[in-house]
């Protein structure tokens, strides 16, 4: 059983949703980013999505675009992101880490090298936003052969004809993007999310995590009553942007994570 399967199974047995947190690797700098990464599990993160900085993050809103820029300016590379995961795994063997980003940096790095190094580092899954199922042979197939889950995004515009194709080779969990548009956009209604999850359940037994537009503990709790996972990214990344120092960024991100975790964990009581 993979770390992702194990984590979602444990939480299902506990009767609660997972808090899935997103931060960009190397933001605001390597050391502070590693501190945040290492601190997230104790602050209540059940699964961590770690963004791989790329110069053209087209699916991301302003907050994550700026985070990517800060990370790149601080010298973050894909090799350093893998190193960050290796350092995280020295002390934490249980929290799943999913790398999220775009195909171009992986293609430049070399797919076979990337898959081997990601597996060795302790990466559990990949979310590659610009690589549709038609291109599975390029990365999804070798990643899954190495034991790395390949997580698909579904959206309000993914119709019933397309959905089985998207979900066919998905593993780990399904990431439902509750709002059409870029990250950090407005949030979806409870009714919309309820209907969307019911539709997805007709096509897959995988855990369903819902993200985009979730910023507060109250919003996180509302989604946690419905979904297997609640994804929060832009709200955490904003804390880094607003911080006056790297130390403050670490403190503020972990503080918000704790508040979100409280919302998620209390949602079904």
Curated annotation (Swiss-Prot):
<dbReference type="Pfam" id="PF00290">
    <property type="entry name" value="Trp_syntA"/>
</dbReference>
<comment type="pathway">
    <text>Amino-acid biosynthesis; L-tryptophan biosynthesis; L-tryptophan from chorismate: step 5/5.</text>
</comment>
<feature type="active site" description="Proton acceptor">
    <location>
        <position position="60"/>
    </location>
</feature>
<dbReference type="InterPro" id="IPR011060">
    <property type="entry name" value="RibuloseP-bd_barrel"/>
</dbReference>
<comment type="function">
    <text>The alpha subunit is responsible for the aldol cleavage of indoleglycerol phosphate to indole and glyceraldehyde 3-phosphate.</text>
</comment>
<dbReference type="GO" id="GO:0004834">
    <property type="term" value="F:tryptophan synthase activity"/>
</dbReference>
<keyword id="KW-0028">Amino-acid biosynthesis</keyword>
<dbReference type="InterPro" id="IPR002028">
    <property type="entry name" value="Trp_synthase_suA"/>
</dbReference>
<keyword id="KW-0057">Aromatic amino acid biosynthesis</keyword>
<dbReference type="GO" id="GO:0005829">
    <property type="term" value="C:cytosol"/>
</dbReference>
<feature type="active site" description="Proton acceptor">
    <location>
        <position position="49"/>
    </location>
</feature>
<dbReference type="InterPro" id="IPR018204">
    <property type="entry name" value="Trp_synthase_alpha_AS"/>
</dbReference>
<dbReference type="InterPro" id="IPR013785">
    <property type="entry name" value="Aldolase_TIM"/>
</dbReference>
<keyword id="KW-0822">Tryptophan biosynthesis</keyword>
<protein>
    <recommendedName>
        <fullName>Tryptophan synthase alpha chain</fullName>
        <ecNumber>4.2.1.20</ecNumber>
    </recommendedName>
</protein>
<comment type="subunit">
    <text>Tetramer of two alpha and two beta chains.</text>
</comment>
<comment type="similarity">
    <text>Belongs to the TrpA family.</text>
</comment>
<keyword id="KW-0456">Lyase</keyword>
């Amino acid at each position: 059983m993979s770390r992702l399967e194990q984590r979602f199974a444990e939480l299902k047995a506990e009767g609660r949703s997972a808090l899935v947190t997103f931060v960009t690797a190397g933001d605001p700098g390597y050391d502070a980013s590693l501190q945040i990464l290492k601190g997230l599990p104790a602050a209540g993160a059940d699964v961590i999505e770690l963004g791989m900085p790329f110069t053209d993050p087209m699916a991301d809103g302003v907050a994550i675009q700026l985070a990517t820029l800060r990370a790149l300016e601080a010298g973050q590379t894909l090799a350093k992101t893998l190193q960050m995961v290796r350092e995280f795994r020295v002390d934490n063997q249980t929290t799943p880490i999913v790398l999220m980003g775009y195909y171009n940096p992986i293609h430049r790095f070399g797919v076979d090298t990337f898959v081997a190094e990601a597996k060795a580092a302790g990466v559990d899954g990949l979310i590659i936003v610009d690589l549709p199922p038609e291109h599975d042979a390029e990365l999804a197939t070798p990643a899954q052969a190495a034991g790395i889950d390949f997580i698909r995004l579904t959206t309000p515009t993914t119709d019933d004809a397309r959905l089985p194709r998207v979900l066919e080779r998905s593993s780990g969990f399904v990431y439902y993007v509750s709002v059409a548009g870029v990250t950090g956009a407005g949030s979806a209604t409870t009714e919309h999310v309820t209907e969307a999850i019911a539709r997805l359940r007709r096509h897959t037994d995988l855990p369903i995590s819902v993200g985009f537009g979730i910023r507060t503990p109250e919003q996180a709790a509302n989604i946690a009553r419905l979904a297997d996972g609640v994804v929060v990214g832009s709200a955490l990344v904003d804390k880094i942007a607003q911080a006056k120092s790297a130390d403050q960024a670490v403190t503020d991100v972990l503080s918000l994570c704790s508040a979100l975790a409280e919302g998620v964990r209390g949602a079904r009581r």
